[in-house]
Amino acid sequence: MAKNIQAIRGMNDYLPADTAIWQRIESILKQVLSGYGYSEIRMPIVEQTPLFKRAIGEVTDVVEKEMYTFDDRNGESLTLRPEGTAGCVRAGIEHGLLYNQEQRLWYIGPMFRYERPQKGRYRQFHQLGAEVFGLPGPDIDAELILLTARWWRALGIFEHVKLELNSIGSLAARADYREALVAFLEQHVEVLDEDCKRRMYSNPLRVLDSKNPDVQQLLDDAPKLSDYLDEESKQHFAGLCELLDKASIPYTVNERLVRGLDYYNRTVFEWVTHSLGAQGTVCAGGRYDGLVEQLGGRATPAVGFAMGLERLVLLVQAVNADFQVPATVDAYVISSGEGAQSAAMLLAESLRDALPTLKIMTNYGGGNVKKQFTRADKWGARVALMLGESEVAAQQVVVKDLRNGEQETLAQADVAARLALMLG
C-alpha cells in the first residue's frame, strides 16, 4: 500500500468549515477597504531574491533565517514572498503607478517564512496588507489606523485589541541612537542572551523588543529613542497622536516598539491582543518613506500595514461568540419518483435565474425522502423544496420551512417570490 502524502509541516489545509468563517471575515475587511477608496493589487508569490534583501535588510531574521529561497533552472535566485510590501513597491515602480501619483492599494494572499510552527504562526500564512503612496503627512497614518479600528468594531473585537505607537525617526536619527544603544549594551554584555549578543552589532534596535525579562529590565536604563528624534519626526508623531485623540482612538506610546524590517521610518504601530497567548500582534505597520527610492523608483512617501489572517480568525473565534457565518445553503431541493430528478434540476436552475443570490443545492445522491431531509439539515438549509411525481405532473412544489416545520404547496411559477419573502 502506498504511503500517504501529507501537507508540509506548518502549511495548513483549510476545510469548508474553516473557509466559511474566513470568507465572512474577508468580506467585511474588503467592504471597509472599499469604503475608504482602496484598490486591490495582485502580485506573484515568487520574486527575485535581491528584492527582499534590499528591502527588508540583509541582517534581519527574515532574510537571514526565514526565507524560502531556491535557484530556478536558469540559476536565478528566487524567493517565496515572506511579506507583501516589497513586492507591492516593485510592482508600483515597474508599472508606473507611483510616478507623481497618490495610490491607496491593498492585497491579500499567502506568505512564506521558515519558522517553528505554533498557534497563530505558520510557515505558509495569509496576510492582508494596505499600502499608501504619495502622502507624507500624519493624516494618512491616522487614516490607516482608523481603517483598522473600523475592522475591529465590525468584527466585534475592538475591546480585545490595543494600539501601540512609536516613532523611530529618520535614518540619521536612528544612526545616532544606534551608537548610543550599542555603547550602553557593551557595558552590560553579561545580561544579554545569545540572541541579543548576535543582534547587538548587526541590528541593535531589535534588542529593544527582546522577550527576555532580564534584558527588558536592563533596557529601563538604556538611552531612549525619543531623545534622538529629529524635529520633523517629533512634529509628525505629535500630529498623529493629536489626530487619534480627536478621533477617540485610545493608544499607548511604546518607546521599545520597533519593526523587524529595516525599511521603516518615523511612525510604527501595532495592534496587540492578550487573547491569543504568545502570538499577540494582530496587525502592524508604519512609514517607509525611503523604500521606493531604495528599490529604484523616485523618492516617494509611503505608509502601510499588514495583518495576519490566521491570527485574526483565531481572535474572532476566541472572543466573539456571536459572530455569524451565513448558512452554506438557503434552499435544498428534494425529489422522489419518476421524472422528479430532472424536474428538480430544472426548478433549481429557474430559481437561480430569478434569485441570483440564492444558495440552492439539489439532491443528486439518491436516497429516500427522510435521508434527503437529513442532508438538507447537514447543509444548514432553511427551506426544503419537495418534488414528487404528483407535484411534477401538476407543476407544483411543496415548500417547507425547516425552522418551524410549516409547509405549503405552490405553483412552480410562485416559488421564487415565496422564497424571496421567506429568506429575505
UniProtKB/Swiss-Prot annotation:
Name assigned to this protein: Histidine--tRNA ligase
Highest taxon above the source species: Bacteria
Gene from which this protein is expressed: hisS
A GO cellular-component term linked to this record: cytoplasm
Enzyme Commission code(s) on record: 6.1.1.21
Protein family per UniProt: Belongs to the class-II aminoacyl-tRNA synthetase family.
Subcellular location: Cytoplasm
Entries under Pfam families matching the protein: HGTP_anticodon, tRNA-synt_His
One GO term (biological process): histidyl-tRNA aminoacylation
Keywords: Aminoacyl-tRNA synthetase, ATP-binding, Cytoplasm, Ligase, Nucleotide-binding, Protein biosynthesis
GO MF annotation list: ATP binding; histidine-tRNA ligase activity
